[in-house]
Amino acid sequence: MQNYKYILAICLVCWYNITWSQITIQNIEIVRDAYGVPHIFGETDAEVAYGLAWAHAEDDFKTIQLAYMAGNGLLSKHKGIKAAPIDFLSQVIESQKTSDSLYNTLHPDFRKVLDGYTEGINRYAELHPNEVLEKELFPITPEKIVAYTFFQLFVSNQADDLMIAIVNDEVPVYKPVTNEDTKGSNTFAFNSVKTGEQATYLAINTHQPLDGPTSWYEAHLISKEGTNILGATFAGAPCILTGVNEYLGWSHTVNYPDKADVYSLEMHPQKKQVYVVDGKEYKLKKKKAQFYIKVLGIPVRLSKTYYTSIYGPTLKNKSGYFSVRTPTLFNIKAMEQWWRMNKAQSFTEFYNILKMNALPSYNIGYADKNDTIFYISNGRIPKRSEQYDWTKVVPGNTLKTLWTEYYQTEELPQVINPKSGFVYNANHSPFKSTSQNENPQAEAFSKTMNYELYDNNRSTRLLQLIEENSIIDYITFKKIKYDRTLPTPLAYNFVDFNALFDMKPEDYPDIEKLLTRIQLWDRTADAYSMGAGAYAVFYYIIGEYYDQLGPSKKFDPHF
């Protein structure tokens, strides 16, 4: 009998290893090129994910850990009170609970990739204990990866701004982004109609911070399961987020349709924490979020109350109870969709993957070896009632405002193979994405989607350069990519400075030389441009008086 127990124990150990570890370390090879970029080879996608985790940890284990701590309510234990709001938010939106409850909605093949990535991270941590920032974070699990992605995408939907406004006793409203002329991303693609030869060009020109959780990490992933992609990813992500394989490539820029809503609950006048929707009473679910402050370097745990309603996570301030609702709260498949995009081999396959409708937002610029170019202002956009102004607080006392459906991929602004031969985006309006007569029309889309309608300096200059050249060869393509010139007239989306160039310098003797230098400037920025330096002085000084420019935000020399 003892022999049978011994054999059974061995079988169980073998079964455990087969079931829980899909990784053969000997199959993984990490080869770094002259720039240090890891080229990671493996038999399976899971093994490549293990290698990606290892290589990224070698280069920046700290940022990966900080990212995972943020999504799993542990960042304040490491950083103290300055990270407490982040931990509070991750718990209010229930990152961990949602990732746990929805984890099995992920495809088993992608779950293997997550398993491989976590094995790589945990093995690195095991062999480098002095680099571990917070022991409680480990072991990393697939659910913890998903929880961080869930948190990150909630923030990318600008829903955190609504939460912050509620906490600060402000009226939370949709605020269009107005700084995309000072930072942002660009993408553009040309097919053979524009290149004049059998060539298709795609510019991937994303602008991310140089460090931190949203800084790019470049890698090349190759498996025998159909993965062969070179591109960039974020800390803790198990696949490439923007890049190119041997068939196609895509880039992202940030877009700004209205993806998050805030509701004012109608509270029962007598019953505590009871709200009323269409005459029916509902009880708020009261919960506690825990976070840390440090006293003499020792973490001390505190708690703060939050609630959930049928609309979503709910907070109380001096004005009442407010709920926030955004599509990322109900879906965890975004990273799986990116992984599938890594492996796409044709436009049809790529487009069908987009139909998963799991990415919460982001413009996509696309090109492939079959001369297909494509642009879409992508997103998981809710279908809302037209009778409400969704840029403001909406009533939380009716099911008419409780949206549950989303626009499908085919219903979003997009352009496929325009006759002009080009598509482009620079964080501006999706209704200005190719030649004028081929653009999507804003009137064809619900106003509740609240898509951007503006141009900016980068989009204006980009279109100028494209239209100046009937044919764009590769040399011209690169010149456009590296262009550093502002358009004439200026096209900031948040202020109009053009009157500056109409001023008469002799009328302003105190700044005559400075003004003359600005007006003679060729609007090209480089390290040796005196005009660019003079304009920068004006730009940053006038910024201090931005609120005094009036509703038009138009610069007046006499203001």
Report each predicted region and the residues it spans.
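Generic signature of intrinsically disordered, low-complexity, basic-rich segments
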Residues: K5, W15-N17, I121, F322-T326, ...
